[in-house]
């Protein structure tokens, strides 16, 4: 059978943000799917608990958002997770637990224990196997995944999981059986610098974390954009792109790479932080320089030349924040890896001069205090 489809039109803080399209597993959980479809359609009468409130998701909000877990909605009576109602009455039984919570973007019933399904449901943002056997999975998001991620990232009110800005279902309904998701529905918009990758690899339709070549391509592409911007002296843009590459690397944990691919990934763990360091120096973001260079010094793939660069750049950062002792320590250590480097030698001389000036300034200050 053709699985039925429904949609939510979403606004955040009153601004329209787009549409989420769901496909319902009516062939597996017909009663649960029918409940959702009827609540999207909004033609099943009024709520028994509040006779002036329609049985409809329209006008309701996503009242609970937990990053790296799920986003919850469906309380159209109380708007806080304490209400809602099914088309069958206040609650209905768990239909079955056949489908597992094994991926993001699944649609699953929220409940307060066994056989307490109503109208509240949630969309998974990651696999949630601990919910298997407790919550009924009855559909999935087939369009609007970027919007789901946007909702997931909403800032919440202090001490709660409620978004600070209302995430509202402005409209909802059913789609025809022959509806097809547009080919470019999940395509990431290209920014003005040519970057069309999401901020996170797991959110990007172009990247398959099980295929290392797609990860490498993502890192290389964004890194090249950063280098182009650096050459054009757009240092802050370059820094942002290099940091994006660094984020890609830190969220990628392969366990079965061949030697060649592992070398590429490990090399990135040296070149990307070094690029961050030089762009951050140009941007006067000295904290980022120190963090990036420290990562290089601990990287397995860092050779003597890379360590010299890291120590040199970190030394310059310390120099610029007037910590001449730390600057000299790094710069002198850099000479053990690159003994005849003119730039390092100059930086050492500049730092010695600066420290001497600081010492003389302190002496004058003390003489005025006690003179």
Swiss-Prot record:
It catalyses: [protein]-peptidylproline (omega=180) = [protein]-peptidylproline (omega=0). One of its GO terms (biological process) is protein refolding. GO terms for molecular function: cyclosporin A binding; peptidyl-prolyl cis-trans isomerase activity; ribosome binding; unfolded protein binding. It comes from the Eukaryota. Keywords: Cytoplasm, Isomerase, Repeat, Rotamase, TPR repeat. Its EC number is 5.2.1.8. Residues 7-174 form the PPIase cyclophilin-type domain. InterPro entries: Cyclophilin-like_dom_sf (IPR029000), Cyclophilin-type_PPIase_CS (IPR020892), Cyclophilin-type_PPIase_dom (IPR002130), TPR-like_helical_dom_sf (IPR011990), TPR_rpt (IPR019734). It is found in: Cytoplasm. SMART domains: TPR. Gene3D superfamilies: Cyclophilin-like, Tetratricopeptide repeat domain. PPIases accelerate the folding of proteins. It catalyzes the cis-trans isomerization of proline imidic peptide bonds in oligopeptides. Belongs to the cyclophilin-type PPIase family. PPIase D subfamily. This is Peptidyl-prolyl cis-trans isomerase D. The gene is CPR6.
